[in-house]
């Protein structure tokens, strides 16, 4: 085989390999752009501000507005859940945190709040699995 033949062979091999791995790229979720992003960011920051100031009803309203604008936000689910967990019913906070962890499984804070809620609901085995995953 000549040098040109070898170079052509290597080039084709690299091209095929690149194509093979290119097909396995993660699908990128659509994100917010333009006015929707501005509205979402404003509502989220106002929700955090209200939460810090102790105005939990307003915070919930702002975070609910965020969910209407973009319902794939794990951060909004976390913030809502961290407020709702202060009540007696843990059903909705548990659902929100399961969804948040599903959206971002490697986020430590989401997993910790999920495990905490599971403990409060006396779902100890499931909470242990979440803690074990964190270790």
Label each region the model flagged.
Residues 52-53, 86-87, 120-121:
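Register position in tetratricopeptide repeats
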Residues 26-42:
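TPR-adjacent "capping" and linker segments in tetratricopeptide-repeat scaffold/adaptor proteins
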Residues 65-66, 99-100, 133-134:
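Canonical positions in the second alpha-helix
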